Amino acid sequence: VTMANIAQLINNLQSLFLAHEDRFIVTPNFHVFEMYMPHYNGQSVRTVFTAPEVNFTKTDNNPDQLSGLAGSASLHGKQLILTAVNPSITEARETEIMARGAKIKAAAATVLSEKDVHARNSFENPDAVQVKKAEVRIAGDNALFTFPPASVVQLTLELG
């Protein structure tokens, strides 16, 4: 990613911030932008995701599908940044993550997800939706991680 742009920065639909008089809060969209920032100046890495598709009905009552997981990866020396989205609002995605030609030595996860997919930050509850750390297991040369339903996840993988 060379540049990301958002037109409505403050007090609009999908904005990063909300402000009113002397109050200022960040939205979940801010956290997503922050989670994708580590890709900056990285070497793009091809990713392949295999997960069951998410079936849904559009507002015009026509059926449609989304990939069960989607994301991107970038390499910074021996550190691989993987960001992914699980669009299913009901199903977690148990995964095995492989780095072709490398061994995953250590891993950390940052997760943005809430049980209520309608949760939002407000002036009354500014920290309702926050990023959280999650466990990533190492199994041999690979990593094991469960993507929660309706989540955006940043994995930092140390390669050896």
Predicted features, each with a name:
Residues 52-66, 80, 85-160:
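C-terminal beta-sandwich/jelly-roll accessory domains of carbohydrate-active enzymes
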